[in-house]
Amino acid sequence: MKTPPELTTLSSEAYESVRRRILQGELPLGEAVSRRRIAAELGMSFLPVSEALMRLELEGLLESRPRAGTRVRIPSRDDVQGHYIVREALETQAARLFAKLATPRERTELKKLAARVDALARKADRLHYLQLHERLHRRIAECARCPALSHAIEQTHSLASTWLCVQGGGKLEKLDHPHEDLVNGLCDRDPDVATEAMRSHVQTSLQRTMIRLDPYFQLGHTSDRKFIRKGRGTTLPS
């Protein structure tokens, strides 16, 4: 895996701005991303914008073609399934270590955070939801006390968050308390119970993501033959 480049202050500003637009659905899958337009909107030169887009491309959120430009990347079914295989391997290990190593204070913290995530999931504030959702999974990994594992898990969440937001705008979760149930399993202090709780959670997320992305899979295949032009996004079939 390539390491994302270090960003300057302006590059970081551009990175956060474009990433936020993707997560909020302002830049949907397949949408063209114009360096010129972003630079003008943010009042900066092309260089920091190009650095930001390069990092987003390395993270898998964007893709570029020579003489065609840059767009929000449309994943294939294999992309999504492969991503979740990796995520399951990483996060089940984090869950197992959490069950062994987390302190009582950390367990209480995670239970409260999970309740907040599930409460936000029943609202339409998806950006705030995603921030808390990423924080929850990051804290689980941090409590596993393995920095390399924590870093790897954090890298997987940008893509998952983007896919979760597809055709969002309503409630994000259909289950009553998915994250509270997850954390309760992790706090059982049994590594096997924690592992299965996380495995079930990730597999449920995969199923939900595949359903949300299904209309895009064929579009991603057909649009490969004609890369989307500037200012025009992908239109879903009715």
Please state what every model-predicted region is:
Residues 1-100, 105, 210-238:
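Short linear motifs at protein or domain termini
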Residues 22, 98, 121, 186-187:
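Hydrophobic residues in alpha-helical segments
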Residues 57-63, 155, 170-173:
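Mobile beta-alpha loop/short-helix "lid" or hinge segments that flank ligand
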Residues 41, 169-238:
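C-terminal regulatory/effector modules of DNA-binding transcriptional regulators
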Residues 79, 83, 102-166, 176-185, ...:
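Conserved amphipathic alpha-helical segments that form helical-bundle/coiled-coil interaction surfaces
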Residues 27, 92, 161, 165, ...:
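Generic structural signal for secondary-structure transition and capping sites
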Residues 26, 61, 125, 190-191:
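Residue-level recognition of short, well-ordered coil/turn positions
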